[in-house]
């Protein structure tokens, strides 16, 4: 099984066998460590230009893709909001400012009014919706990711609209 890392010297993508402690770039001969430095919190995002998975440190504000040179803005935690689906009450996650969210479970479109929105806590912990139903003996959380149609922002660029829903699997 192989993994990928970006060369610290020339920014090329390097393939290496999983488990290797470091990899030497064939282009610039720089040695890159495959393990993140201690204390570094690593996050991932998908490049808006070429859809490549990018890895970056959490304190970054933007990430340049080494494949297509697109500069991807990193969305701060405070720009992600939650609301309950207007039909099945599944908790949905959406980018702050979106006018509506389509539920991946029941396909209901919920308007994102200020009275239904919940911000993600700033420490990065996940949101847990309070339960209004009787406790179940064995519930299993299911996470559903839906990519809604792309929209155009004020600068004329395409913007991805990704929705994440979490359900206990009780309602369909």
From Swiss-Prot:
Residues 82-112 are annotated as: Putative zinc finger 3. This is Protein LOL2. The keyword Zinc-finger does not apply. Putative zinc finger that may be involved in programmed cell death and defense response. Keywords: Nucleus. It is found in: Nucleus. Residues 4-34 are annotated as: Putative zinc finger 1. Residues 44-74 are annotated as: Putative zinc finger 2. The keyword Nucleus applies. PANTHER family: PROTEIN LOL2, PROTEIN LSD1. GO terms for cellular component: nucleus. Its main location: nucleus. NCBIfam families: LSD1.
């Amino acid at each position: 099984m192989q993994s990928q890392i970006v060369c610290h010297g020339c920014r090329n993508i390097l393939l290496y066998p999983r488990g290797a402690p470091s990899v030497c770039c064939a282009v610039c001969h720089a040695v890159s460590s495959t393990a993140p430095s201690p204390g570094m919190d690593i996050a991932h995002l998908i490049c808006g230009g070429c859809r490549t998975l990018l890895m970056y440190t959490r304190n970054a504000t933007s990430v340049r893709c080494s494949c297509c040179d697109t500069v991807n803005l990193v969305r701060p935690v405070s720009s992600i909001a939650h609301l309950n689906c207007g039909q099945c009450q599944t908790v949905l996650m959406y980018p702050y400012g979106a006018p509506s969210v389509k539920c991946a479970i029941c396909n209901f479109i919920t308007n994102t009014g200020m009275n239904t929105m919940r911000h993600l806590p700033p420490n990065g912990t996940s949101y847990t919706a309070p339960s209004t139903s009787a406790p179940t003996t064995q519930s299993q959380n299911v996470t559903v990711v839906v990519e809604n149609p792309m929209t155009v922002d004020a600068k004329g660029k395409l913007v991805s609209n990704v929705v994440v829903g979490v359900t206990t699997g009780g309602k369909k």
